[in-house]
Amino acid sequence: MAKDTTGRLRVTVKSAGRLKLSSKLWLERQLNDPYVAQAKRDGLRSRAAYKLIEIDDKYHFLKPGIAVVDLGAAPGGWSQVAAKRVGAADGRGKVVAIDLLEMPEIVGVDFAQLDFLHAEAPAKLLSMIGGKVDVVLSDMAANTTGHRKTDQLRIVGLVEDAAAFACDVLKPGGTFVAKVFQSGADATLVTQLKRDFVTVKHVKPASSRKDSSERYVLAMGFRGVPTTHDADAPMATS
């Protein structure tokens, strides 16, 4: 073991058998990531939970008693945070987690294993939760191909789909939070969000790895009437 620049002991993984270099580097990063260790201590399912905690600590959109939907929720770190903050376990708030994959139960969270892109998904969610929601969360990332431009388009396309879903299910004044990656490809997305929400900004939590282009788009104050087809709608300032 060696110490890193902060004085912490750093674990180095020796190459063993058929372990690929990419797997070795990923394992080293996981073993040396303080947020991974903290998540285990706090009983959280992923380090990503701290990103939502940081964003909400600053912008305060997860309020007790509100309704939240978490898209692409597995393994459930964001759903855990949302459930705790809105009081879902004691029935004050509601959280619905949606994913194509199965997800172990979380107290206070209703789970729907479905494709949010399906035409009937918004109606099914509204039926489950008993009306429109206050917050839509998305920490989803599109499958990548290794081709930079193709991957950027896939990533932005997924966020655009999540934003369209949010506009179908949000109450006026609602909030949409989604993972994006820094690139020029999301300009159209931001323009559209500024038509549908009062405030739109990018956020980079400290728990997001410094070497990652990952950041989050935070759209607050849903106007209540999606303007997808209104190209002449006035744009709000962020």
UniProtKB/Swiss-Prot annotation:
**Annotated binding of S-adenosyl-L-methionine, by residue:** 76, 78, 99, 115, 139
Q: Which GO terms describe its molecular function?
A: rRNA (uridine-2'-O-)-methyltransferase activity
- A GO cellular component annotation in the UniProt record: cytoplasm
Q: Which UniProt keywords apply?
A: Cytoplasm, Methyltransferase, rRNA processing, S-adenosyl-L-methionine, Transferase
**Keyword RNA-binding recorded:** no
Which of the seven top EC classes does this enzyme belong to? Answer: transferase
Chief location bin: cytoplasm
Location of the protein in the cell = Cytoplasm
Q: Where is the active site?
A: 179
Which InterPro entries does the UniProt entry name for this protein? RNA_methyltr_RlmE, RNA_MeTrfase_FtsJ_dom, rRNA-MeTfrase_E, SAM-dependent_MTases_sf
Taxonomic superkingdom: Bacteria
Record Pfam families: FtsJ (PF01728)
Q: Does the keyword rRNA processing apply?
A: yes
EC code:
2.1.1.166
Q: Which reaction does it catalyse?
A: uridine(2552) in 23S rRNA + S-adenosyl-L-methionine = 2'-O-methyluridine(2552) in 23S rRNA + S-adenosyl-L-homocysteine + H(+)
PANTHER family associated with the record: RIBOSOMAL RNA METHYLTRANSFERASE, RRNA METHYLTRANSFERASE 2, MITOCHONDRIAL
Q: What family does this belong to?
A: Belongs to the class I-like SAM-binding methyltransferase superfamily. RNA methyltransferase RlmE family.
Function comment: Specifically methylates the uridine in position 2552 of 23S rRNA at the 2'-O position of the ribose in the fully assembled 50S ribosomal subunit.
Q: What is this protein called?
A: Ribosomal RNA large subunit methyltransferase E
Which gene produces this protein?
rlmE
